[in-house]
């Protein structure tokens, strides 16, 4: 009888009765190999060791009636090759069958372990591939960010150079305009000088003439830097204060932003003051400016 032989074989191999009965029932009594496959596939089921409860109207054998027990033999599955009844196996035959089934089970387990090993290798390959792709994405983002920062710095440096160049160009234009203005007016000053000597007979009035001599064309500026060192140079009296600022930027500011002040009387020069001539700011003929942090 096929079902009893399968169940007995599983029990002899050491499987629990509940597991063996479930394997026989769920495989439809289709042989020991199918039952063993089912046991290996479901060995981790939480209810694998619970008693088997057949569904309503069914028992362990698919062709059995409810009145039959799992050990009863249905007439429809009698062994036609051996006659009307299956001869019981001898002890030696039973041991050989158990050994064969154990070898089969070991082979199936080895196949499953190999399959799981291959699946593990594939999962590890996929994990490494995903890790490499993620690393490449991060590197690309970092490279893009560094490139963006470098472009921004180049842009800022270019804008700074252009701003300094505009100031230099303006200073050059102002110098040229002053040169043309004062160069053309020198003759008229020479022509008007003789009448200025006419009131020489009245000494009290001549004493008011010296203020006219204070109309200096040059201005000496001394600048005290943040580190205590000083810069000193000469500017035209009509040059704007921006010329002094550019001079400091090019010779001692070290790229820092700063203010220009006069210590006494104390005055902090603003951006509007940068366009005013040194004469108008009272820095002629000489002055001391101090650099302070902005």
Swiss-Prot record:
Cellular component terms per the entry's GO annotation: cytoplasm; nucleus
Coiled-coil residue windows: 89-159
Keyword Transit peptide part of the UniProt annotation: no
GO biological process, one term: negative regulation of proteasomal ubiquitin-dependent protein catabolic process
GO MF, one example: K6-linked polyubiquitin modification-dependent protein binding
Residues in UBX domain copies: 214-291
Name by which UniProt lists this protein: UBX domain-containing protein 1
Classification of source organism: Eukaryota, Metazoa, Chordata, Craniata, Vertebrata
């Amino acid at each position: 009888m096929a079902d009893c032989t399968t169940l007995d074989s599983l029990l002899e191999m050491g499987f629990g009765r509940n597991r063996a009965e479930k394997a026989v029932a769920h495989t439809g009594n289709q042989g020991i190999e199918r039952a063993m496959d089912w046991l290996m596939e479901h060995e981790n089921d939480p209810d694998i060791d619970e008693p088997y409860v057949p569904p309503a109207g069914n028992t362990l054998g698919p062709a059995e009636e409810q009145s039959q027990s799992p050990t009863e033999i249905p007439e429809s599955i009698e062994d036609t090759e051996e006659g009307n009844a299956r001869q019981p196996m001898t002890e030696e035959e039973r041991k050989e069958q158990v050994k064969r089934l154990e070898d089969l089970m070991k082979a199936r387990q080895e196949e499953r372990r190999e399959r799981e090993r291959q699946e593990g290798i594939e999962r590890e390959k996929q994990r490494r591939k995903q890790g490499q792709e993620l690393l490449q994405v991060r590197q690309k983002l970092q490279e893009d960010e560094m490139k963006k920062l470098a472009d921004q710095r180049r842009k800022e440096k270019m804008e700074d150079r252009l701003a300094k160049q505009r100031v230099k160009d303006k200073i050059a234009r102002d110098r040229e305009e002053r040169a043309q203005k004062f160069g053309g007016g020198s003759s008229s000053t020479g022509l008007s000088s003789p009448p200025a000597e006419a009131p020489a007979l009245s000494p009290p009035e001549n004493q008011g003439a010296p203020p006219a001599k204070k109309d200096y064309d040059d201005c000496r500026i001394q600048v005290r830097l943040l580190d205590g060192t000083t810069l000193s140079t000469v500017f035209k009296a009509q040059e704007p204060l921006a010329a002094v600022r550019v001079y400091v930027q090019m010779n001692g500011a070290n790229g820092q932003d700063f203010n220009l002040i006069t210590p006494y009387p104390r005055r902090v020069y603003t951006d509007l003051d940068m366009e005013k001539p040194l004469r108008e700011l009272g820095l002629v003929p000489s002055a001391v400016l101090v650099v302070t942090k902005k």
